[in-house]
Amino acid sequence: MDRMTEDALRLNLLKRSLDPADERDDVLAKRLKMEGHEAMERLKMLALLKRKDLANLEVPHELPTKQDGSGVKGYEEKLNGNLRPHGDNNRTAGRPGKENINDEPVDMSARRSEPDRGRLTPSPDIIVLSDNEASSPRSSSRMEERLKAANLEMFKGKGMEERQQLIKQLRDELRLEEARLVLLKKLRQSQLQKENVVQKTPVVQNAASIVQPSPAHVGQQGLSKLPSRPGAQGIEPQNMRTLQGHSVIRSATNTTLPHMLMSQRVIAPNPAQLQGQRGPPKPGIVRTTTPNMNPAISYQPQSSSSVPCQRTTSSAIYMNLASHIQPGTVNRVSSPLPSPSAMSDAANSQAAAKLALRKQLEKTLLEIPPPKPPAPLLHFLPSAANSEFIYMVGLEEVVQSVIDSQGKNCASLLRVEPFVCAQCRTDFTPHWKQEKNGKILCEQCMTSNQKKALKAEHTNRLKNAFVKALQQEQEIEQRLQQQAALSPTTAPAVSSVSKQETIMRHHTLRQAPQPQSSLQRGIPTSARSMLSNFAQAPQLSVPGGLLGMPGVNIAYLNTGIGGHKAPSLADRQREYLLDMIPPRSISQSISGQK
């Protein structure tokens, strides 16, 4: 059946292509009329099928009542296929030839037999096509024929020149429409680019605010963490903390370390805080604070910012030592040092200046716009920016020039030398570009030169911003160095210390002796470097205002005092540093929590 349907469809298409236009219109009218009749027939058959199905469902239950003549239900069929049930009370007098009152309803219009009805009933799987029925391919072919006829009528009664002029005019109109299409496309692209820039601006600002700290700023974060292994000389930048909190110990270690450690400051605290530090000596304080100070001594950046860091660290160590010394065992010395508040102010001002400089650099970098990309190529036809389309246009121009040259005198044509790219020496490109200096470049070389120029301009802007920030940082460091050079750092006057006082001080510092063999195994490299710093450090004294005394001098830190006592002083320094090393349990807890 499907095969017959396809053959019938092909035959109908062939017949329609051979029919004239008038016959087609008549056939269309006939087809519409036949389709109307077929639709009415189908509606009637559907109504009959519905009535028959309903009768089969209800009539067997009502057969006894029909014989009695009570409660008989019937169905009246209308032409539009609707069914209306009614009883005996609604029935009118019997119409002769249509239906009997005492019998069930009989449809007199159903004269066809069952095989005929089954054959004429439309099946959902079979499409019946008549010879006069049109199809969709026919409508499209009809439109093409009409357009072809219109195009032929356009050229009727015109000469060759008039036809060429008309073709040229139509070609110009086509190019204008193509140019308008390109313009609309570019306008749409520019609108989309503006929307994307507006949406991406906050994201770029949020991402640029997370900038890694500069090396100069990292130098201010030297006092942060215990080294993870003895061979570690430097400190990684991600493990450093700023000096804004002025505290060495993290809040996570508060439960494991003594409460007195929270008052130990890297930058020298005020005298009111030092009043709580005086009292009986506690060895745990000295041992636990040393790991947080050793990295600051071993970490020496190239800039001069390490000078105030070492000075504040040594002053903090001296304050810890002064808490172990009895007031009556040392003579007074009149040798004032710069106050801790001045040193803390200098360090704070330096850190604040570098932080402000870093923020200014970040702001400057955010203000520098990224290199603007060149206009994107439009990869659709027709487009003046598409190379393939330009190739076709050029080929069309060449063919047109050849056609024009055949009908004219060849001598009148001008000969033009072909262009050659001054950079890549090629002689073929969709677009030739001429620079201001007269050089002719191909499209590829011109695009690459534009990209290089934009990238170089952006790189120069970034370079200028970094150079300016570096110069400002150097000026700040020089100013701080000059201020540090003006302040006195040494005390010339030294008082004599008796032998008994030295022995008492020695016993005071060694309150918790430990075996030297076990302690020397755990000495980190930073402790050894601090030992060398103490051996080379000039003679320093603690101001008396910190300890409630006119002046206290730590003479055993200077190896030049008393040549005959040099070995004993070196031993004392080594023993003092060994006492400052924390127990293994505390160091492991600190490193584990960090």
From Swiss-Prot:
GO biological process: chromatin remodeling; negative regulation of DNA-templated transcription; negative regulation of transcription by RNA polymerase II; positive regulation of DNA-templated transcription; regulation of cell fate specification; regulation of stem cell differentiation
Main location class: nucleus
Location of the region described as CR1 in the Swiss-Prot/TrEMBL record: 166-191
Keyword Disulfide bond recorded: no
Chain residue ranges for the region called CR2: 341-481
Cellular localization per UniProt: Nucleus speckle; Nucleus; Chromosome
Residue stretches of biased makeup (Low complexity): 130-140
Residue numbers bearing the Phosphothreonine modification: 121
Gene3D superfamilies given in the database record: 6.10.250.1650, Erythroid Transcription Factor GATA-1, subunit A
Zinc fingers, GATA-type class: 415-468
Coiled-coil stretches: 141-195, 450-483
Domain of life: Eukaryota
Pfam families listed in its UniProt record: GATA, P66_CC
Annotated crosslink Glycyl lysine isopeptide (Lys-Gly) (interchain with G-Cter in SUMO2) location: 33, 66, 98, 148, 200, 282, 354, 455, 468, 499
GO-annotated molecular function: sequence-specific DNA binding; zinc ion binding
Phosphoserine carried by residues: 17, 123, 130, 135-136, 209, 334, 339, 341, 487
Assigned keywords, A-Z: Chromosome, Coiled coil, Isopeptide bond, Metal-binding, Nucleus, Phosphoprotein, Repressor, Transcription, Transcription regulation, Ubl conjugation, Zinc, Zinc-finger
Biased composition (Basic and acidic residues): 74-89, 109-119
Chain residue ranges for the region called Disordered: 62-143, 214-237
Signal peptide (UniProt feature, chain positions): none
Function field: Transcriptional repressor. Acts as a component of the histone deacetylase NuRD complex which participates in the remodeling of chromatin. Enhances MBD2-mediated repression. Efficient repression requires the presence of GATAD2A. Targets MBD3 to discrete loci in the nucleus. May play a role in synapse development.
Domain-level remarks: Both CR1 and CR2 regions are required for speckled nuclear localization.
Record note on quaternary structure: Homooligomer. Component of the nucleosome remodeling and deacetylase (NuRD) repressor complex, composed of core proteins MTA1, MTA2, MTA3, RBBP4, RBBP7, HDAC1, HDAC2, MBD2, MBD3, and peripherally associated proteins CDK2AP1, CDK2AP2, GATAD2A, GATAD2B, CHD3, CHD4 and CHD5. The exact stoichiometry of the NuRD complex is unknown, and some subunits such as MBD2 and MBD3, GATAD2A and GATAD2B, and CHD3, CHD4 and CHD5 define mutually exclusive NuRD complexes. Interacts with MBD2; this is required for the enhancement of MBD2-mediated repression and for targeting to the chromatin. Interacts with MBD3.
Protein name listed in UniProt: Transcriptional repressor p66-beta
Name of the encoding gene: Gatad2b
